[in-house]
Structures are given as C-alpha cells and as structure tokens.
Amino acid sequence: MTPATRLAAPDKTRLVNESYANDEPLSVRIETHRRYSVPPVDLPAWALDRYAWRGDETVLDIGTGTGQYLAPLRERIPRGRIVGGDLAIGMLRDLRAKGVPGDARLLNADAEALPLADESCDAIIASYVLFFVPDIPRALAEAHRVLRPGGALLAVTMAHVYMDELRVVVNRALAKLDTSNETRWGVVPRRFTLESGLAYLEPNFHVTVHRHESALVFP
C-alpha cells in the first residue's frame, strides 16, 4: 500500500454535480496557471511533445474537461481519431456549446469503466485526472485494456509539494472554521503525484518520467 492509498477517495457524485457541474472553475484554474506560471509553459504542448506521434493514432483524452488538449493533439495527429471523454456531463455540455476543438468526438466516460473495446486506442491522455478517480488501479487496468500493444498512457500530474505554501495557509483558515478533514484543500491531488504515481503505474506499464519544474508567482 502506498501512502496515497490511505488518503480518502473523492466523492464521484459530488465531483460531477458540484465541482465540475460546468467548466468555469476549471477554466479559472487553467487561466491562473497560464498567467502566473514561472517559467511560462504551454502544458498540453509540452506534454504531447514527450511522445513521438505517427500522425494517424486513435487517442482518448480521458477527463478532457475544457478540451485544452484536443486542438494541439489534432496538430500532431492530422490523420488520427480523437475522443474527448469525461464523466461530467456539464463539462461536455459546455465544451460542445463552445465548439469542440480538433474535430474530436465527445464521450461520457468513466475512467473506471471505459466504454471502449479492448485494444482500441493507440494512446490515452490522463492529465490531472487520476487523483480524482476513486479506484486508481482499476482505472489504470482499464487504460491497459483499451490500449493496443505498444500503446502509450500520458499521465500528467504534479509533485507532492504542489502549492504547499498556499495549501498550509488555506488549511489553517479552514481549521479555524472547524471544517472536517474531508474539506481540507489540497488533499485529493496527493493521491496520484509524481512520487506516488510510479507505484500505481509500474505493475502494468513501462514508465518514463518527464519533469517540468515551475512555480506560481503572483505579483
């Protein structure tokens, strides 16, 4: 058992119906990182460029959210098929209303039970999503099932110390409000980090780690 497995799993229903009922909260977080990350980074482009694309792959972006990976992915696989999957209907609705980038197909999909056939994808993108999945090993087993032999899982996450300073300040304030541990800010991302993720991945995948070091710096 890794230390991360002892952290409480998030409530899937609450995530879908509250935290990700629409795309506004996630859009704000993405824009915050775009404005204040030092050094600046186009994260989708950076992550996608860690892999050598042929140009004709079938790719699932699970937890697609605002669809920020779809357009840059299309640039890299002009002849490929792209599926943007998300458990949150509200996110898919907002994405469709704003126009789906990359001519992608949208799919209501649970990472723990992917509605896709065995060996149907060449690559799966899971960016900042695996720590939200209640049963991480099950989700990774599903990814392994859906991937073709030689396929790739691009699992993007943060380090364990992600925004530690801000987390301490926020949790001190929450403690004064007598909130429960369930509401402590910053706990969920620690379930699958750069450090703890290897223990989850190595049973089914050959793992290569790529690091991008940055910080949020506010004026």
Positions of the model-derived regions?
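A structural alpha-helix within SAM-dependent methyltransferase catalytic domains
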Residues: 48, 71-74, 137-144
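Class I SAM-dependent methyltransferase SAM/SAH-binding core
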Residues: 58-113
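A short acidic, Gly/Pro-enriched loop at the edge of an enzyme's catalytic core
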Residues: 112-123
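A short SAM/SAH-binding and catalytic strip from SAM-dependent methyltransferases
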Residues: 123-136, 159
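Conserved class I S-adenosyl-L-methionine
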Residues: 2-55, 68-72, 91
